[in-house]
Structures are given as C-alpha cells and as structure tokens.
Design a protein with these regions (language model features):
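Glycine/threonine-rich ATP-lid/beta-loop region of ATP-binding domains
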Residues: 1-43
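Gly/Gly-Pro- and Ser/Thr-rich, intrinsically disordered tail segments characteristic of DNA damage-repair
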Residues: 1-17, 160, 165-193, 212
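Charged regulatory segments coupled to nucleotide-binding catalytic modules in large multidomain enzymes
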Residues: 47-185
Length: 213
C-alpha cells in the first residue's frame, strides 16, 4: 500500500466543497485492499444540496486521479449505487440533489476495456465501494434527520410566536393582573424582561347613601 497515492479525505473534501458547493458533504477512505495481487485504495465522497446540484443522483468517477467521463452505466460504481444500495434505507428521497464521488487508486486499475472508460466489476473492488458508500450515506442520513428535527422545531416556534402572546394577554385579563407573564423567554428571544402592562379596568362605583326613613 505504500506505493499507492490516494487523494486523502482533506483534499477530496476540499475539491467537493469548491466545485459542488454542497449543503453537506462527507468523505471516507477505505483501508488498502487487493484484487488478483494488485493493491488498491477506495475513496468515496457524497455531496447533498447546495447551489450546483440539481434533483437526482449523479456519479463522478476517478481512477488514479483521472476522471472517467464515459460509459458510466457500465462502471462497477454505478452498479453499486443503483443496484446494490437502496437509498430509501437511508431515508434519502429519490429526487434528492445528491452526488457520489468515487476514486480508485491502484498499481493496476481494473479497466474492463482497452478504452479505459469504466471499471470492471471485480468482487473486491465492489465490496470496498459498497462499504465506503454506505459509510458516507449513514453520515448523510444523520444530517437529514437532524435537519428534519430542526424544521419541526422551527414550525412549532412559529406557532408559539403567533398564539402565545394572545394566550398570555387573555390569561392576564382573566386573572385581573396588571402585568403579563414573562412568556418571551420561551420563544428564545433576548429582550424578554419587558413586561406588558395591562391598563386598569376598574370602574368607579358611585357611593350610594342609604336614606333612613
């Protein structure tokens, strides 16, 4: 494995961040492996959302730092992400803006044809690609779950901001207090110590003098 030169997670991540500008990305590098006596290292990255990606799954393939531009559907990487891995298991919508980036570095890349346009489906390479892709998809799943929970919290806070002031004012009027309760801290606001004063609604009652007959 000392003879191999992978991109590394930092360099691969920097490239994804620069070119795709994603909302989220994750990269991983698998331990060295071998097929037919030839060592290789598998690197996989995933990017989600952002300004560049559109809806649907996209695959970017590299071999020994050289991009592979043709015959994508014949590549073992496409077989892995389209047939071997179910995106629904990771709660990723089918139309999600997602890109998978694969890089194989080896002393002998297992090209299937002399044109060197796509990789053959070697079991060892397929195994490493599958495990690396699953790892980055799990990280994406955690991100999407956190994002979904934050959206739920945001919707709840919007409802609270709309109705809590009305509830507080109604409760103050019903109790006859002069000040409303300090409810704004529940909304995450900072200028919360200001209390709304409720005008006194006491009506003056004229003195009634009883006449003694």
């Amino acid at each position: 494995a000392a003879c191999l030169s992978p991109l590394g997670e930092s360099l691969l991540g920097a490239g994804i961040r620069k070119e795709l500008q994603p909302e989220f990305f994750a990269v991983t590098t698998r331990p060295p492996s071998a097929y037919s006596g030839y060592p290789f290292i598998t690197e996989v990255g995933v990017a989600y959302g952002g300004k560049v990606l559109t809806s649907g799954l996209k695959l970017f393939r590299f071999a020994n730092r050289i991009p592979l531009l043709y015959d994508e559907a014949s590549d073992v990487a496409w077989k892995v992400i389209s047939e071997e891995i179910d995106m629904r298991r990771y709660r990723i919508p089918s139309e999600a803006p997602i890109a998978v980036i694969t890089h194989i570095c080896s002393t002998k890349i297992p090209y299937k044809t002399v044109g060197k346009e796509y990789l053959a489906d070697r079991p060892e390479v397929e195994y490493e690609l599958k495990n690396a892709t699953r790892e980055v998809l799990r990280r994406l799943q955690h991100f999407l779950a956190h994002k979904g929970s934050m959206e739920v919290v945001k919707r709840k806070m919007n409802i609270y901001r709309k109705y809590l002031p009305l509830v507080a004012r109604f409760a103050t009027e019903m109790s006859g207090a002069n000040r409303s309760p300090r409810y704004r801290r529940l909304l995450g606001e900072q200028d919360m110590d200001k209390q709304e004063s409720i005008p006194d609604k006491q009506e003056s009652i004229p003195d009634k003098q009883e006449s003694i007959l």
